[in-house]
């Protein structure tokens, strides 16, 4: 039994006259002049099969997506029927035998790229969705992407090491997913949010250059671009400075862009400190494919009579603006911008348009002096028709508002251009909503200065850095703490008392005591990188079998109920209130 | 700040006179003639540092495994002190500066390969254990092994596709590990025992050639070579016959052996049917590095007067023997063999030694006729001193007993030779201890003949096959069922009624309805392959961070108790009896 002698796209005019056997799916079928033309699709592409239903009766049974085997002779297509858009468009197979390997029920949706199908239906029939050309291309690209990453790191002398996924719960900013233990009832493993501590242990273990393409887990409330499980490239090196990390990650990202986009990126990538990124782009993950940079206007308005501006300055705030270019701005559109600014946290927004006659059209124009008006035009390099947006508030709010409006109004809607950059010098700590201090990156990140961290923690800068692509945070890394005394100090600044630190991290603090090398590393999301490189809007389109935003697989209906006996073996039970709620819902 | 200009083994006599900076660990330190000799170890190996403590006082502080940075000049070693067993044995670094990067506490055990350390202690300090040369070599080998596997499959046009690890519970012969869902309280994900159904879905999705190095999970009661989580190479192809699978896996295993052992294996590998393997070696995973094959003796004893033999034959059993070669056999040793046979399930064991004078020494010799005695010698090709072991019982018991004794007495105690083979033609079903019928491989395996499967299921042969290396089952595979009607028939033979099949597998049976290609595949354990190739006795020595046999990580003490609030969010609680037992134990 042979299913095939050739793949579809192996066939071309050099093979004319050869007998061939191909297997694949019926992608299209037309009848013309008593003869059937079947586009047979396999993993490589399409080839046209010509069959006479009078000779081969089974051809009349063929329907869309039937899986078939065809034996026949390769022939040149008759003049005028050559299809130049098809790789095999110069030939066709004249069938001698057609075998139906598997029939197909009528399809729930068409398998071309043009159909817009509800995502839940696509996921319910993911195995059909994956036959669509752009989804098949996404799977292929992802495989090539991880291949290129591995080759690059292999050449750089990295070891791929598998770290455990049934670990002890560690606090990394999101909820752990738990796995009850059967042999130690009442105890739980956690699924890793990242291999962070294990890769640091590998450094202590003398590995020096580690990487892993690792499955990680975060039980966050779903946002559009999050999944319960995701994949990250995780890497770490010993005797490394920040420069070593950045150069290595650049080599990996260059290889990725070359493999998937066939472009050679210029290195080193642009670098911005976190402060610069916030000041110029109002974001710690700026999209630098376009300008509209934020301009400081404080000095221009230091004597202003316009109360909103003077009030902001008096309150220790700042006045900043962006020029969003020449565009139509109806009153309704202007109101829309103000509403959006409020959504982003502003109390209001000043909009100004440079009219045809050079005067400023704005509800606040009358409050601004001539000097202020001309200063605005020159500072924001405004031309006729340009729209200027100005916010006055605390620095954080102004940055957030102008950064958000900048993206709304300027962001390209394709991913054709690739703009990578580094953001460095992140603050060591940040404030939680409840006012408590927490780590910005994770609690194993090294401060730039230990003294500064202790004396003025809220202004302390860490040795952490992010890689950003087209406004998407690809990943982050840092130089780690390798001195157990410093690690204890960081816990202290975070308000973790000694006893708690010992209970939760004692084993790790002990490991640091045995000649830990200085080390640092990085991790970035494969899903997000693949998404941008493939020009997709959703990570779900580059994940073979994703979950919905509520963590459900519509195909298998996971998660599901399980037998009570299984739970009993694990020493757990479902809480009474959950069962009651389920019964009430009539399940 | 530069930690190093060179790795230890970059340095040789061509570098004499160069100033170099190296970083690593103090592997050994001797003092001789007022000068300190420090073996500095990094990931590449060792280099000797010479320092004068009078000039560089810090040298006196150096202890084992301190992490240090040394700057100095490369010099040839004085005549008579060259060390030919060391890659850098012709040179040494004369230190100008030594910096302690991290001190180390005194070690809990010596880091050489000679020390025998209790495994629990090794795992408690795994980060130190990994610094030992053979453990470092195991990590490196494993990375090279998966690299070679990936390169091979990449060249063969396979896509690496990541399948989900939070799935719906499926029955594959072992217990699932469960993950409670927070967004759907009272529901659970399962961790996959293998990517089986998802890889079949990829075939339905048109991928045609898939592989993945996949983390899998089995909550089995621990045996010496099992872990809760393990890694397998998982592959699948469409339009494939058994031959296609075997050729592909052979290519992968050949690449693995070449990479790790630098040997070129002859292909195709030997193939035995399951029946042959059981008959000749008494095992479905025979170690064929040595003979001692099982010989059928039924016809020799068809008229025997020895009751044990005639009784076995009359009861439908069989008489078989092995020649375990010339060896000392005291009465106590012989009794030991009989005891071992009983452990293996025999009621007794006949032992015979060919004495110096050619007569047979055996408690049963007197019951055997001259013809039977000479027949035994000729059938078992016995020479002077040879020990013959004979079992008479049901076929299954005889195979088990002689197969077990054969391994005890013949198995080489190194893994120097690599003997791969295929076992094919496994039975479709087998009997569970309680007499019910279950699948031998998994319920998605195709029978050789559907008619036979329905008419005589207990004798039906499947299209399943195992790869065996030196008596270790590396993995198994099969041609799958691609016809939903056949899949339903298999469920029926397994006693799974239609409603249950629909409830548990309805989504998969539906997927099979959409033009499923014929397909088959394979999976083998990376841990076991790495173990044999590295000549280790335990898979734990090739897993970076394994668990103990009770599923515990002695380093982090996972699994651990978690906060009640975390459990509440997940809608679960620990059962009262578990809490009571814990309190009783005084925890």
Q: In which residue ranges do the predicted regions lie?
A:
Chain A
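Class II aminoacyl-tRNA synthetase catalytic cores and aaRS-like
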Residues: 1-587
């Amino acid at each position: 039994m042979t299913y095939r002698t050739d793949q579809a796209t192996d066939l071309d005019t050099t093979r004319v006259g050869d007998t061939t056997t191909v297997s694949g799916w019926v992608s299209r079928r037309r009848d013309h002049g008593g003869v059937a033309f079947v586009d047979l699709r396999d993993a490589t592409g399409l080839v046209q099969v010509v069959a006479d239903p009078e000779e081969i009766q089974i051809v009349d049974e063929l329907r869309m997506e039937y899986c078939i085997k065809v034996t026949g002779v390769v022939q040149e297509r008759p003049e005028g029927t050559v299809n130049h858009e098809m790789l095999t468009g110069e030939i066709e197979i004249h069938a001698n035998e057609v075998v139906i390997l598997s029939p197909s029920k009528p399809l729930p949706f068409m398998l071309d790229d043009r159909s817009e199908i509800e995502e839940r239906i696509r996921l319910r029939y993911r195995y059909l969705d994956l036959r669509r050309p752009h989804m098949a291309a996404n799977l292929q690209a992802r495989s090539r992407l991880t291949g290129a990453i591995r080759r690059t790191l292999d050449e750089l002398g990295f070891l791929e090491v598998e770290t455990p996924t049934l670990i002890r719960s560690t606090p990394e900013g999101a909820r752990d997913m738990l796995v009850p233990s059967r042999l130690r009832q009442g105890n739980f493993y956690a699924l890793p949010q990242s291999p962070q501590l294990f890769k640091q242990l590998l450094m202590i273990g003398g590995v020096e250059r580690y990487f892993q393409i690792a499955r990680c887990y975060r039980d966050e409330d779903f946002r559009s671009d999050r999944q319960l499980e995701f994949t990250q490239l995780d890497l770490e090196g010993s005797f490394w400075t920040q420069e070593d990390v950045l150069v290595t990650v650049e080599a990996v990202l260059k290889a990725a862009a070359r493999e998937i986009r066939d472009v050679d990126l210029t290195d080193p990538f642009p670098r911005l400190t976190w402060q610069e990124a916030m000041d110029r782009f109002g974001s710690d993950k700026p999209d630098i494919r376009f300008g509209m940079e934020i301009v400081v206007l404080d000095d221009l308005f230091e004597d202003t009579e316009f109360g909103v501006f003077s009030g902001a300055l008096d309150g220790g705030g700042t006045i900043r603006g962006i020029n969003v270019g020449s565009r139509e701005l109806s009153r309704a559109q202007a109101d829309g911008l103000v509403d959006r600014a409020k959504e982003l946290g502003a109390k209001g927004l000043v909009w100004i348009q440079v009219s045809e006659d050079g005067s400023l059209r704005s509800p606040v124009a009358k409050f601004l002096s001539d000097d202020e008006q001309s200063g605005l035009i020159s500072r924001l390099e405004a031309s006729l028709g340009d729209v200027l947006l100005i916010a006055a508030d605390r620095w954080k709010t102004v940055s957030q508002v102008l950064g958000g409006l900048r993206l709304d109004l300027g962001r390209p809607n394709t991913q054709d251009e690739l703009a990578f950059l580094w953001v460095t010098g992140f603050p060591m700590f940040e404030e939680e909503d409840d006012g408590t201090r927490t780590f910005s990156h994770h609690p194993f990140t090294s401060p730039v200065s230990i003294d500064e961290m202790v004396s003025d923690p809220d202004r302390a800068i860490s040795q952490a850095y992010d890689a950003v692509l087209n406004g998407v945070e690809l990943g982050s890394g840092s130089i780690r703490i390798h001195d157990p005394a410093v690690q204890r100090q960081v816990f202290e600044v975070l308000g973790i008392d000694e006893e708690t630190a010992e209970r939760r991290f004692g084993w790790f603090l002990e490991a640091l005591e045995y000649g830990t090398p200085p080390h640092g590393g990085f991790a970035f999301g494969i899903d997000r990188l693949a998404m941008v490189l493939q020009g997709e809007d959703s990570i779900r389109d580059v994940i073979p079998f994703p979950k919905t935003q509520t963590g459900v697989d519509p195909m298998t209906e996971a998660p599901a109920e399980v037998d009570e006996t299984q739970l009993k073996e694990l020493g757990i039970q479902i809480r009474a209130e959950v069962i009651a709620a389920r019964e009430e819902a009539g399940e």
